[in-house]
Amino acid sequence: MKTYCKLLYAFPLLAALFAHSACQANNHLKVNTTTITQLDINRYMGKWYEIARYNHFFEKGMTHVYTEYSLQPNGKIKVINRGIKDGKPKEIIGKGKQPSPKEHPGQLKVSFFLWFYSDYYILELDKDYQYALVGS
């Protein structure tokens, strides 16, 4: 009888914790991904240093990370990520594109492996192109 009562009291507590966790998970998914509405792609090209990030597989454990963007003659963007890992320089070369420059100038796509592209959203950009907030 005592075990049954303990389980009976524990069930509402577990249900409440589960509901709270589900709400927190939902809050995590509701990130504002509104991108900038104007972008001069030529001004965006160049070297950008990372101040903070969520690690991607190719940046895990890296420090002094920066990315260089260069516009290619075919309109694609060359992307080179560089950094230091275990005291040694590392780099990965990828490609980027701007699928809808007129409708969604701040929504780009970046690929570091074959034809698999990830979202690259410019969420904020300084008017002088001195800093940017990027998400996916």
Residues of each region from the PLM?
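A beta-rich soluble binding module of mature secreted/lumenal proteins
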Residues: K2-Y9, L14-S136
